[in-house]
Amino acid sequence: MKKYLVTLLAILLVSCSSATDDTNVSLESVDTSTTSTTEATTTTITTTTTVYIEEPWAVDEFGIELLEMSPNMKTQFEELMSFVERRVGLEFTEFPLFNLYTVNGYQEYNAVSYLDDFEEDYEEGEWERAVLSENMWGLTTSTPDQMKNLITEFQRCASAGSYNLLDKILRVPIQKGQDKLNLWEQSVIVHELTHSLQGQHFQVSEWYQEMKELDDFSAYPGIRALMEAQADYVQVKWEDGLDAYDRTTMNSQVPNISCRVQLPSYFYIPNDLYYSFGPQLVKEILNKEKMTGLNEALYRYKNEGLNSLPTAEQVYDSAKFFTNDRYDDVSITTLEIENYQLIDEGTLGSLDIVYVLQDFIGRVESTIAAVGLGGGSWKDYVDSNGNLVMSVKISGDTKQDLKEIYDAYIHWANVQDRFDEVVDFSGGKLYKGKTNVWISTDGSFVRLFLSQDISIIESQANNLNSY
């Protein structure tokens, strides 16, 4: 289903501008010719204009300018490393990799690197199915090309700094031509240095690679939330050391990183888990178990493997974290659908529920449904024309939890004007429209079945309550 981003973004949605001081300037003469013509003569006037061409100190793999770290910046960087080590209680095993950009260069890198990985991240037809799925869930009406452009813009504008799980490089935009990092830049670097330290100790590259090989990112949201919350905590502690004047100065230094188009609000729903619920959970962990307890949770992959990582449900509801409540395995039958074949399948997590429901029924009701999740599974089917059929099966922790999940999906369907009518069908509610959605519960599971072709749902009438 959803492929999560490779990059750990420090989503501190901020506004700012970048300085463009000129350094390392070379001179080059350029001839500009202007020709004027009359009936009698032709006169050619040649003028020589001197333009300044700045030679970059270095460029990255995409030819984007990198900025040099001055000796004073390196001293600041090392001081920030020491601060992060003291707060996290771990030491860097090697000097962190880093790239410093201008603000514009950093935004360009985010967009270009996403597009460069795009073909590798999606198999043939997979992107089109992913966008069609979001259309059928009512999240968007965008075409695959439009959605690609929107996500590229989201990548371009959504972060103030980043740490990449795979190449392990910390990337931060700074003002050009300065000898020292300003306070805002130092604050962002503290956040990203925390991620770099995590990368050196918690095998984050390894667990991401394992998820990618399995083509299953269901374990990603929970561990991502803990990583972001730890980085946020260390960053806040660094900012707490500033006096009122320095804090005001830091706020004035925030660059103008803004999106050029209005992005769908549901793009930001995972960030609510990472940057709102995550810090709430980490605050409880620190109160009960100190930083040692948080590090132990982040060490789980290294010590116990992928299936031990915290779930999104544990982040939404801290009580489930401390009891290590896990998702149940939910078996879902493969259906025989004429002219369709099974193309993909996987598990459903709490973030998936909130992701689909929140924009329609609100944060509170969708989160209540998510924290009552027992477990879930889904299967996708496709025909030769790329049409999609989706089946979902969900259990609750209790009968009441299951009812809340069912009620949330019914509410989700009822508030959408894309459905022409709703009828009782095969023990459930059938919402008819361009996408047809069947929702039912038998007291043990909630089932959803989505198809663009109503005849497919009708042909599955005897199977809908048993898959």
Task: Identify the residue ranges that each predicted region occupies.
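Catalytic zinc-binding patch centered on the HExxH motif and its immediate surroundings
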Residues: 106-128, 143-170
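C-terminal soluble interaction/assembly domains
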Residues: 386-467
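Short pre-active-site segment immediately N-terminal to the catalytic Zn-binding motif
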Residues: 170-190, 222
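Post-HExxH zinc-binding segment in Zn-dependent metallohydrolases
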Residues: 80, 200-205, 209-253
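Pan-zinc metallopeptidase signature
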Residues: 262-393
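Extracellular mucin-like PTS domains
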Residues: 25-51
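C-terminal motif of bacterial Sec signal peptides marking the signal peptidase cleavage site
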Residues: 12-15
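Bacterial lipoprotein signal-peptidase II cleavage site
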Residues: 17-25
